[in-house]
Amino acid sequence: MYDAVVFDNDGVLVGRTSFDTLREAAWDAFVSLGVDDPDLIHVDDVAVGVNPATLTDICERYEMDPAEFWRVRDETASAAQIAAARKGQKTPYDDIDTLRHLDASLGIVSSNQQATVDAILDHFGLAGQFEVAYGREPSIASLSRKKPSPYYLERVLEDLDAETAIFVGDNESDVRAADNAGIDSAFIRRPHRRHIELSCQPTYEIADLHDLVSICGRAPVDPDESI
């Protein structure tokens, strides 16, 4: 039914990173640039979901260069998440093997760092399942390209030469990114999204990755093949 199936990564293919891990990484970024006691509100602001304007304002308060701070922040956040994966604190979901049953090209679009996406896919032996995987580059400009912007999603679709596609995500921003790219969406109700009410309408709502087989079609599979 679709030329391509594109996935968000965190909360869809692998578990999410705990906020405490991201907060600690953000704190370490401040400290590494000479700010030993940053306001915890500012630490939380840059830990998750910061926009360029807020980032610039915070950096001005501490007389830091925004571009340098954001590079360090992304590096520390990436290192913390990779460490969590290696410690078994961030692992693939149990239904990950479903990927090999999907009759379409597979891709990833994540708002996480490119380095984090690449390292986690490699660590769990998943990289070969995807023809392309995009995360953010460590720049302030990347913050404006995150979902719901279709920027990275459109790059994946172009790379896969896909005329029809579906984007699978666990956030409203994923559904809106799919809408903005002109493709279908599937909102996956992992346990952390089981009871959330959406203010936008995905094409499908699914309980787990197994539901995608009936939506996307089943590919021929070698019984000896595994992820």
Q: Where are the model-predicted features located?
A:
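N-terminal helical cap/lid subdomain that shapes the substrate entry/recognition surface
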Residues: 2-100
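Surface-exposed amphipathic alpha-helices with a cationic face
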Residues: 96-103, 175-179
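Conserved phosphate-coupling serine/threonine residues in phosphotransfer and NTP-handling enzymes
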Residues: 110-112
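Asp-based, Mg2+/Mn2+-dependent phosphohydrolase catalytic module
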Residues: 2, 114, 120-227
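Generic recognition of short, well-ordered alpha-helical segments
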Residues: 17-21, 119, 180
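Internal, well-ordered alpha-helical segments in soluble enzyme and binding-protein domains
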Residues: 55, 95, 116-117, 152
